[in-house]
């Protein structure tokens, strides 16, 4: 950033009309502004709940964009049609990878409607407490992937003695086995090699089932776009993120949904979202959630404060406010309709 005018000591530094810090000293016009001369301090935010809210003008159904999607029995629509091999713990990761790796493009050539066979593994699931928020989060994540519309079928593998018991995980999610959602326990089938063989056999049985689902023309209103920052630098808020924001506005106008995830990434600029919240109550939920994060991180080594990672700083971001400002631009200018508090 370059100072556009003379900036007096302790004056507010604004980016996109949002305060990202204060001048450490008198700074002449033309001076580079970065972490060496921008001081991070607490800024009183004007949430102005719902002041700028405008209902989105949706296109009539007959004018909305379409795409070729896979329609699922429950009404969800997928953009891909994978068979997923998931794990209850890291103990089953090798088995999951070996099963998935068996299905090369050549072996899948006879099933053109199958996007692939892919492993979803984790380093967790064993050597951790059996109850509490971390196990709950792991289970919701695994079963969330298993039931994602982009999976036409899923096999969840487990060693059998891990802390994340596979039966408990299914029960926690309120799910039962079916033709397209199966359990595979390594100890029950006789070890790693036999589990790989059994997994391959099951996938071979699932391939014609999943392949029977074909793409069809559907409205863009079925699309759900998840937004996440990655590798932020000084240009993210000028290029990639605003471009995503524009795409979000177009998607919502066509009846679709966008989710601005990782609420910690908007710390310090949440007032730019509360102003366009559908109701003051929705805006307050966002503020409450940011405050929850601040409380949750007390005493931990991952404080939400003014610092950014060395890579972010080297890339041109002075502090977390500037990073958050760029990250929030992924949400476009569409109204904030709801805040999900489940983490």
Regions found by a protein language model. Name each.
Residues 66, 73-92, 96-97, 103, ...:
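Anaerobic metallocofactor- and corrinoid-dependent redox/one-carbon enzyme cores
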Residues 29-32, 41-48:
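Short, Lys/Arg- and Gly-enriched loop/turn segments at beta-strand edges
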Residues 42, 171, 183, 267-268, ...:
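Terminal amphipathic helices with adjacent charged low-complexity linkers/tails
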């Amino acid at each position: 950033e370059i100072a556009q005018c003379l900036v007096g000591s302790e004056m507010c530094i604004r980016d996109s009309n949002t305060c990202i810090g204060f001048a450490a000293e008198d700074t002449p016009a033309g001076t580079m502004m970065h972490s060496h001369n921008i001081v991070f301090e607490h800024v009183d935010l004007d949430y102005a709940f719902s002041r700028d809210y405008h209902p989105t003008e949706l296109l009539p159904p007959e004018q909305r964009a379409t795409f070729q999607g896979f329609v699922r029995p429950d009404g969800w629509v997928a953009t891909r049609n994978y068979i997923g091999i998931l794990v209850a713990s890291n103990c089953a990761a090798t088995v999951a990878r070996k099963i998935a790796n068996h299905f090369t493009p050549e072996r899948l050539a006879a099933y053109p409607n199958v996007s692939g066979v892919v492993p979803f593994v984790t380093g967790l699931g064993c050597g951790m407490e059996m109850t509490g928020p971390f196990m709950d989060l792991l289970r919701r994540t695994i079963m969330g992937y298993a039931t994602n519309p982009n999976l036409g079928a899923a096999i969840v593998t487990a060693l059998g003695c891990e802390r994340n018991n596979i039966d408990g995980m299914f029960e926690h999610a309120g799910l039962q086995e079916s033709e397209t959602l199966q359990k595979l326990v390594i100890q029950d089938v006789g070890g790693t090699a036999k589990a790989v063989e059994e997994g391959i056999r099951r996938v071979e049985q699932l391939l014609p089932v999943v392949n029977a689902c074909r793409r069809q023309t559907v409205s863009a209103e079925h699309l759900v776009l998840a937004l996440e920052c990655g590798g932020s630098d000084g240009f993210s808020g000028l290029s990639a993120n605003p471009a995503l924001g524009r795409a979000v506005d177009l998607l919502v106008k066509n009846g679709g949904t966008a989710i601005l995830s990782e609420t910690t990434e908007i710390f310090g600029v949440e007032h730019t979202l509360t102003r366009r919240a559908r109701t003051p109550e929705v805006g307050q939920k966002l503020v409450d959630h940011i405050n929850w994060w601040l409380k949750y991180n007390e005493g931990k080594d991952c404080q939400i404060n003014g610092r950014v990672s060395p890579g972010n700083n080297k890339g041109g971001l002075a502090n977390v406010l500037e990073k958050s400002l760029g990250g929030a631009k992924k949400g476009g200018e569409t109204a904030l309709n709801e805040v999900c508090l489940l983490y």
